[in-house]
């Protein structure tokens, strides 16, 4: 299962991902770390599409090894979210603007998501999301058996 935790910078994506990934024994893909490894700091629309594709590729590689993936990144547009193609989307709707004006202008609130986080209480949200995702993973495995 590929889980996307998306939202504006400063919304709590990384904090939540850090709590969820170990609870699900998942591979954690943090966009900042992936950008650092790729040495790609281009935040234009094309750079963001490239980052989304990079995150998708890494997630798919982990899933081929039967791993659950938790990816946290802005994923600011419908196009980047569709490109990443998550099985489960968490929208971090905890702030309305970030410190980066270009990101504020580009960011499109998602219309499709599985879970909407509305406050910065990572422990509570991690518990709720983990419970729901564990059930979905169990159902998915049962269907495959």
Regions found by a protein language model. Name each.
Residues 5:
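Hydrophobic anchor at the beta1->P-loop junction of P-loop NTPases
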Residues 2:
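Walker A (P-loop) ATP-phosphate-binding motif of ABC ATPase nucleotide-binding domains
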Residues 24, 85-87, 112:
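Short, structured coil segments at secondary-structure junctions
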Residues 17-61:
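Conserved substrate/cofactor phosphate-moiety recognition/catalytic segment
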Residues 10:
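Walker A (P-loop) phosphate-binding loop of P-loop NTPases
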Residues 45-98:
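Glycine-rich phosphate-binding loop used to anchor ATP phosphates in small-molecule kinases
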Residues 83, 92-145:
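Small-molecule kinase domains that catalyze NTP-dependent phosphoryl transfer to phosphate-bearing small molecules
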Residues 13:
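Conserved lysine of the Walker
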């Amino acid at each position: 299962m590929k889980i996307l935790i998306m939202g504006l910078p400063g919304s709590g994506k990384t904090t939540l991902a850090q709590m969820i990934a170990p609870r699900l024994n998942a591979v954690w893909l943090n966009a900042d770390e992936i950008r650092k490894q790729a040495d790609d700091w281009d935040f234009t629309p094309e750079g963001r599409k490239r980052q989304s594709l990079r995150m998708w590729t890494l997630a798919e590689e982990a899933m081929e090894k039967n791993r659950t993936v938790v990816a946290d990144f802005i994923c600011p547009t419908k196009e980047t979210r569709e490109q990443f193609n998550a099985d489960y989307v968490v929208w971090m709707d905890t702030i309305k603007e970030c410190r980066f004006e270009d990101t504020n202008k580009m960011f499109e609130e998602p219309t499709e998501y599985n879970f909407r986080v509305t406050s910065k209480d990572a422990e509570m949200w991690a518990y709720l999301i983990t419970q729901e995702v564990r059930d979905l993973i169990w159902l998915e495995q049962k269907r495959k058996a």
